Curated annotation (Swiss-Prot):
InterPro entries reported for this sequence: Chaperonin_Cpn60_CS, Cpn60/GroEL, Cpn60/GroEL/TCP-1, GroEL-like_apical_dom_sf, GROEL-like_equatorial_sf, TCP-1-like_intermed_sf
Subunit structure comment from the entry: Forms a cylinder of 14 subunits composed of two heptameric rings stacked back-to-back. Interacts with the co-chaperonin GroES.
Subcellular location as annotated: Cytoplasm
Tagged with keyword Methyltransferase: no
Record function comment: Together with its co-chaperonin GroES, plays an essential role in assisting protein folding. The GroEL-GroES system forms a nano-cage that allows encapsulation of the non-native substrate proteins and provides a physical environment optimized to promote and accelerate protein folding.
Chief localization: cytoplasm
GO cellular component: cytoplasm
Chain residues that bind ATP: T30, L31, G32, P33, K51, D87, G88, T89, T90, T91, G415, D495
GO molecular function: ATP binding; ATP-dependent protein folding chaperone; isomerase activity
EC number in record: 5.6.1.7
The protein, known as: Chaperonin GroEL
Top-tier EC class: isomerase
Gene: groEL
Keyword ATP-binding in annotation: yes
Length: 541
């Protein structure tokens, strides 16, 4: 086992604080509308330019092992805030730095670290309650656009696009961000349920100019099995032909004689048919077939529940207003399923999302909710160069997360004002002893740090602005973009409550651990380890 280097007390804390400051100083230059860029060198290709706090934090590794431990713990704050709310990483880092710096000063002055931590925790719990009181719901498009704009570093086009996307697909819809091909940002909305399976034979195409199959008011047969024998399907085909409507078959697979017969029938115009494979695999395929059945008011023909294809009747088939199938995708528009049944299914899937442990499962379940409830929107980010594209895409993703958080828990005044107002409400808060009171003061002082940093990045004097803001009340604050004071809500400067809350909670959590650190252990650098193998000297001869 390698030899260890151990540091205690103040020696350890000073080293740790140095690491915290290096990381936090690099991250906090990006805060606010006048935040600066950070250039990150890559081992290959062009460097990345970013204003995204968590991207900067992830790049930082320090040579000194003890300093690096401090930096890595603050990196954890940024990552956790990013995972919880998708934004607020820089705010969380600034808060953590302030709590750690002030907290370690108090420890050096002889305060009890455990009581300091208890005081900080008490202040944060009270602050979260105050934030909830300040929070206002964010439901209209204008507020959503404002939140998106602020989170995308004051890029109005991004905020407006996200608001449009949410309007089109609803709050539950899936919105994805992709790299576009042009210079302009575009919004692409897919209404109805779309899944990644195309037609099984190009002979089904009835719109040669677009290379697609379009079926108007079709019946939809859903089968959880492979269909290779046409005899199984004859009763359904005859019933559909009599009804004079087209038929879409969604099955595990359609092959051999069955597929050939369907193609011949289509080409002769006897009955208009198209076949596609069911989406997904295994249990997920069964679940998605059930989703389609509920959306279209049909039944999945499955041998597991004792249903046979030969005995299927028209009542078992789903229906939709229109179906469009191309090479890779199938879109079902306006299924005739009952709204109450669809809502019941959505509630059931939401419950599964709550219980899911892996991010992949959550994402897939979220997609299913979107397909049933709203639709899917794709934001295509446009830019002139690859470097700009990457930077912009990261900002758009941040803005999207922030708007979702805003819809979820509401919004508070932005620009660091909400935390200043919260701190003002808690001046009377007291702990069980003087050391805990100092901990409370440390947390309350830290709540001013995001406002001070935004002002500092804008090139103004933080103390002057902070005093002016504190002299006001409610949503009165400082707009660093235009350098004027006024109502932050009227300025359109909003922060999602969830983002502010998460930033404060994670910053206090990690900072509390660091203040109560008394010993740090790391491997000795290779060159410093004692050389135990220095051989015994040979006999001179």
């Amino acid at each position: 086992m390698a030899a260890k280097d151990v540091k205690f007390g103040n020696d350890a804390r000073v080293k740790m604080l140095r690491g915290v400051n290096v990381l936090a100083d690099a991250v906090k230059v990006t805060l606010g509308p006048k935040g600066r860029n950070v250039v990150l060198d890559k081992s290959f290709g062009a460097p990345t330019i970013t204003k995204d706090g968590v991207s900067v934090a992830r790049e930082i590794e320090l040579e000194d092992k003890f300093e690096n431990m401090g930096a890595q713990m603050v990196k954890e704050v940024a990552s956790k805030a990013n995972d919880a709310a998708g934004d607020g990483t820089t705010t969380a880092t600034v808060l953590a730095q302030s709590i750690i710096t002030e907290g370690l000063k108090a420890v050096a002055a002889g305060m009890n670290p455990m009581d300091l931590k208890r005081g900080i925790d008490q202040a944060v719990i009270a602050a979260v309650e105050e934030l909830k009181k300040l929070s206002v719901p964010c439901s209209d498009s204008k507020a959503i656009a404002q939140v998106g704009t602020i989170s995308a570093n004051s890029d109005e086009t991004v905020g407006t696009l996200i608001a449009q996307a949410m309007e089109k697909v609803g709050k539950e819809g899936v919105i994805t961000v992709e790299e576009g091909t042009g210079l302009q940002d575009e919004l692409d909305v897919v209404e109805g349920m779309q899944f990644d399976r195309g037609y099984l034979s190009p002979y089904f195409i009835n719109k040669p100019e677009t290379g697609a199959v379009e079926l108007e008011t079709p019946f939809i047969l859903l089968a959880d099995k492979k269909i290779s024998n046409i005899r199984e399907m004859l009763p359904v085909l005859e019933a559909v032909a009599k009804a004079g409507k087209p038929l879409l078959i969604i099955a595990e697979d359609v092959e051999g004689e069955a597929l050939a017969t369907l193609v011949v029938n289509t080409m002769r115009g006897i009955v208009k048919v198209a076949a596609v494979k069911a989406p997904g695999f295994g249990d997920r395929r069964k679940a998605m077939l059930q989703d389609i059945a509920i959306l279209t008011g049909g039944t999945v023909i499955s041998e597991e529940i004792g249903m046979e294809l030969e005995k299927a009747a028209l009542e078992d088939l789903g229906q939709a207003k229109r179906v469009v199938i191309n090479k890779d995708t199938t879109t079902i528009i306006d299924g005739v399923g009952e709204e109450t049944t669809i809502q019941g299914r959505v509630t059931q899937i939401r419950q599964q999302i709550e219980e899911a442990t892996s991010d992949y499962d959550k994402e897939k379940l979220q997609e299913r909710v979107a397909k049933l409830a709203g639709g899917v929107a794709v934001l295509k980010v446009g830019a002139a160069t690859e470097v700009e594209m990457k930077e912009k895409k990261a900002r758009v993703e941040d803005a999207l997360h922030a708007t979702r958080a805003a819809v979820e828990e509401g919004v508070v005044a932005g620009g660091g004002v909400a935390l200043v107002r919260v701190a003002a409400q808690l001046t009377e808060l007291r702990g069980q002893n003087e050391d805990q009171n100092v901990g409370i003061k440390v947390a309350l002082r830290a709540m001013e740090s995001p406002l001070r940093q935004i002002v500092s990045n804008a090139g103004e004097e933080p103390s002057v602005v902070a005093n002016n803001v504190k002299a006001g009340d409610g949503n009165y604050g400082y707009n660093a973009q235009t350098e004027e004071y006024g109502n932050m809500i009227d300025f359109g400067i909003l922060d999602p409550t969830k983002v502010t809350r998460s930033a404060l909670q994670y910053a206090a959590s990690v900072a509390g651990l660091m203040i109560t650190t008394e010993c740090m252990v790391t491997d000795l650098p290779k060159g410093d380890a004692p050389d135990l193998g220095a051989g015994a000297g040979g006999m001179g001869g």
